[in-house]
Amino acid sequence: MSKGTLYIVSAPSGAGKSSLISALLESNPTYAMKVSVSHTTRGMRPGETDGVHYHFIQKEHFEELIQKGEFLEYAEVFGNYYGTSRVWIEETLDKGIDVFLDIDWQGARQIREQMPLAKSVFILPPSNGELERRLNARGQDSDAVIAKRMSEAKSEISHYDEYDYVIINDDFDTAQMDFRSIIRAERLKQDKQTTKYKGMLEALLAD
């Protein structure tokens, strides 16, 4: 059995990366895919569930886990910590399951340094105006927070060229199709197919 592929997915807040990942998993229920549930010190938003959207923990606990080396990557964003469990990622990939990480460019850099075989995808909004409209439509943040997110968006977007793939989320269905195409192409690579069809290939090449 071949190992799963780790996908790093980044985007400015409001570009739709979480929605695209969720839609991908829902539309491919037979595929072995999971989303990594990060740890965070930020407060829980309406509609979120502990252990499903994030593992919500106190700052002191998070810093203890940092000292123990429990995170594959971690970063401080908007005054809150976010981190990814090292053990869970490695065990899940060993089972042949693809894992998706919804993280920012800082975390992506840390992941690539430690796991160079990971594939990375950057989601772009079609315009700054559309990005701001989406942030307002969520109804989750104050005007001040939205202004800060828009200010940070340019910095986040400036790192798009560090990624393997880039998707423009203008039309959601088209963006979702592009995302599925990336996963499909990765699964058709020679090394993956050789492992999956080892017996068939041996039979085809037998004298």
UniProtKB/Swiss-Prot annotation:
Entry keyword Cytoplasm: yes
This protein's record includes keyword ATP-binding: yes
Entry keywords, A to Z: ATP-binding, Cytoplasm, Kinase, Nucleotide-binding, Transferase
Binding sites annotated in the UniProt record for ATP: A11, P12, S13, G14, A15, G16, K17, S18
Listed InterPro entries: GK/Ca_channel_bsu, Guanylate_kin-like_dom, Guanylate_kinase, Guanylate_kinase_CS, P-loop_NTPase
Reactions catalysed: GMP + ATP = GDP + ADP
Main location: cytoplasm
Recorded family membership: Belongs to the guanylate kinase family.
NCBIfam families: guanyl_kin
Protein name: Guanylate kinase
Gene (UniProt): gmk
